[in-house]
From Swiss-Prot:
Region Disordered, residue ranges: 496-549
UniProt-listed Pfam families: ATE_C, ATE_N
Keyword Transferase applies: yes
InterPro entries: Acyl_CoA_acyltransferase, Arg-tRNA-P_Trfase_1_euk, N-end_Aminoacyl_Trfase, N-end_Aminoacyl_Trfase_C, N-end_Aminoacyl_Trfase_N
Protein name as annotated: Arginyl-tRNA--protein transferase 2
Organism: Arabidopsis thaliana
Keywords linked to the UniProt accession: Acyltransferase, Plant defense, Transferase, Ubl conjugation pathway
GO BP, one annotated term: response to abscisic acid
Record family assignment: Belongs to the R-transferase family.
Listed SUPFAM superfamilies: Acyl-CoA N-acyltransferases (Nat) (SSF55729)
Keyword Acyltransferase: yes
GO molecular function, one term: arginyl-tRNA--protein transferase activity
Enzyme class, UniProt record, top EC level: transferase
Length: 605
């Protein structure tokens, strides 16, 4: 290969930051199929497809931001002006997210489940998941709340008693070491549960404050009383402050050992017990990439009183029989699929296979721009007492976490695991932005305004929709009036609709459905390859042939190995073949954009 050709190949590899190598795509052309959303019997769902087995995370990020999505190794983009159900890419800036009342209830429902106050119910025992939380708390449940509260308090008493005893032991150690006088009658320690209203008074940044003890204050008072009784003693000179006493007690407790499930701190003379988060890296063989597998005992980290343990594990996309069995149960129970329609092959093709090149968290110049888990495709497992109850299929990219699919155990349908997993994924983006500053967004896939099952996506506010023409992000509240009028709209034409026409009051009318956050209907899972890739004969060949050839001159093409710009490829002897190729390249450039057409490698097949 000449130096010029080598340079051309290197340009493609390095143009997106030098991570992940190069992207290679094959154009599948236009595809017409029946629609899984409007359930049309005719082939009115129209999209353009690409096949790829190698795609960099940067290039996929750029494709997402121009309306593409992936199903396994197949990339597809709706032809918005022609398809029956225009699909708009929807995203949310994680740092701006404001949970709705219903989303907060979903979190509380999980908390109650983990506390043992609420049992999960299977699909047949639950009503529509968009019912309000007040309907779940029936009259009979309300009558039992008092008893449940008393039971919970009884469970917490041994914890407070144990913490009190540990403080008492620390007091004795301070006396033995001479830090506290031995002739002082020191009272027994008392530990109390902290309620949210009092947390800010006791400590700054005390969202996770669970228990507190003010033992330092009676100790100081007892010392003062004893010293006052001793004649000739300079009381002020020898007096310890509550802050100093609590620090000495904390030091003594730390020498004994760590408090399981708690972080102990002192503030304003109080000894505070905060919840602790346990984060561990997954065990791995030598040479295996670090996956940043995170174990979270519960969403609020209340390790002490949980009857059930919730854990989340992030792992690279791979086939696991346990996940496949859960997927089969989910498809049959929730989507009413027949067992014979589900196969290991289709499951792998849909949810395991990925073209994304793995990017580990180390080994690159811009390590500070890569999260600890790296970039690529992942499965997020949710386990309750080690039982797999849900799996979220996600892509982690330079600018976002893209949610692809979620399947869950039908026995846990009442917990709204789709909504809960979305909230967890939003939290993940917030937490990891500290390490990867570019990772700001949560992508929820496609939004179809006419599909009621999609409405829950717009309930994650403030969300944005991608304009299908200019690829600009438009606030949902601005886009909604346009979509109310017609399914396809150039959303960036905001001059026609005042942003004030969509009021906050109007936005409250959105149905906050708890339909699980899935990007595709079941039809996308079991489509035969022949149907998916069947290119429509109604092409744009006539119009494309009249386009200026210079538009496609810099498209990077693979010719059985070598990478060449189209302008460097010798002309074909057959003008018909030349015309067909140029027509294909014009169409390809149109759907992926000029920039990506010169970066990704176009593979001729």
């Amino acid at each position: 290969m000449s130096s010029k050709k080598a340079k051309t190949k290197n340009e493609a590899s390095s143009s997106r930051g030098g991570i992940g190598g190069e992207s290679i795509v094959a154009d599948c052309g236009r595809n017409k199929s029946t629609c899984g959303y409007c359930k049309s019997s005719t082939r009115f769902s129209i999209s353009h497809g690409l096949w790829t087995e190698r795609l960099t995370v940067n290039d996929y990020q750029a494709l997402l931001d121009s309306g593409w999505r992936r199903s396994g190794c197949y990339l597809y983009k709706p032809e918005m002006e022609k398809t029956c159900c225009p699909s708009y890419t929807i995203r949310l800036k994680a740092s701006d997210f404001v949970p709705s009342k219903e989303q907060q209830r979903v979190r509380r429902r999980i908390e109650r489940f983990l506390d043992g106050e609420l049992d999960a119910k299977p699909s047949e025992q639950t009503e529509d998941q968009d019912v309000s939380f007040s309907r779940e708390v029936s009259v009979s449940v309300k009558k039992s709340l008092g008893a449940a509260k008393r039971e919970k308090n009884n469970e917490l008493e041994p914890i407070m008693k144990d913490l009190s005893e540990q403080i008492d032991n620390a007091v004795q150690k301070c006396i033995q070491s001479g830090e506290f006088p031995s002739n002082v009658q020191i009272p027994k320690a008392s530990v109390k549960k902290v309620f949210s209203a009092k947390r800010k008074k006791l400590a700054e940044g005390s969202e996770d404050l669970l228990y507190t003890s003010n033992i330092a204050f009676p100790i100081v008072a007892a010392m003062k009383h004893t010293q006052t009784l001793e004649k000739g003693k300079n009381v002020e000179e020898n007096r310890l402050s509550p802050e100093a006493v609590s620090e000495k007690l904390l030091s003594a407790m730390n020498k004994v050992g760590e408090f399981t499930g708690f972080s102990v701190k002192v503030s304003k003379g109080h000894i505070n017990f905060l919840s602790a988060t346990q984060v561990t890296s997954s065990d791995r063989n030598e040479g295996e990439e670090s996956l940043c597998a995170t174990t979270i005992k519960s969403s609020s980290n209340k390790l002490h009183a949980r009857k059930r343990k919730l854990e989340m594990h992030l792992k690279r996309s791979s086939f696991e029989p346990e996940e496949y069995e859960l997927y089969k149960r989910y498809q049959m129970k929730v989507h009413n699929d027949k067992p014979e329609s589900i196969s290991e092959t289709s499951y792998k093709r849909f949810l395991v296979d990925t073209p994304l090149t793995e990017v580990p968290s180390s080994g690159y110049d811009d390590e500070e721009k890569i999260p600890l888990c790296g970039f690529g495709s992942f499965h997020q497992q949710y386990r309750v007492d080690d039982r797999l109850i849900a799996v979220g299929v996600i892509d982690i990219l330079p600018k976002c976490l893209s949610s692809k699919y979620l399947f869950w155990d039908p026995d846990f349908a009442s917990l709204s695991l789709g909504n809960y997993s979305a909230l967890q994924e939003i939290d993940w983006v917030k937490q990891n932005q500290a390490h990867c500053s570019t990772l700001e967004y949560y992508y929820l896939g496609y939004y179809i305004h006419s599909c009621n099952k999609m409405r829950y996506k717009a309930a994650y506010r403030p969300s944005e929709l991608l304009c299908p023409l200019r690829y600009q992000w438009v606030p949902f509240e601005v886009a909604k009036p346009l979509l109310d009028k017609k399914p396809y709209s150039v959303l960036s034409n905001i001059s026609k609709v005042s942003s004030s026409s969509s009021s906050p009051q109007a936005s409250e009318t959105l149905l906050e459905s708890t339909s699980e956050h899935e990007d595709m209907e079941q039809g996308d899972t079991n489509d035969d390859d022949d149907e998916m890739y069947n290119s429509d004969e109604d092409s744009d060949s006539d119009s494309s042939s009249s386009r200026n050839r210079s538009d496609i001159t810099n498209i990077l093409i693979s010719l059985n190995g070598p990478r060449l710009r189209y302008k460097d490829i010798p002309r074909f002897k057959n003008p018909v073949v030349q015309k067909q190729l140029e027509s294909m390249l014009v169409s390809y450039r149109k759907v992926v954009g000029a920039e990506l057409s010169e970066i990704m490698v176009y593979e001729l097949r």
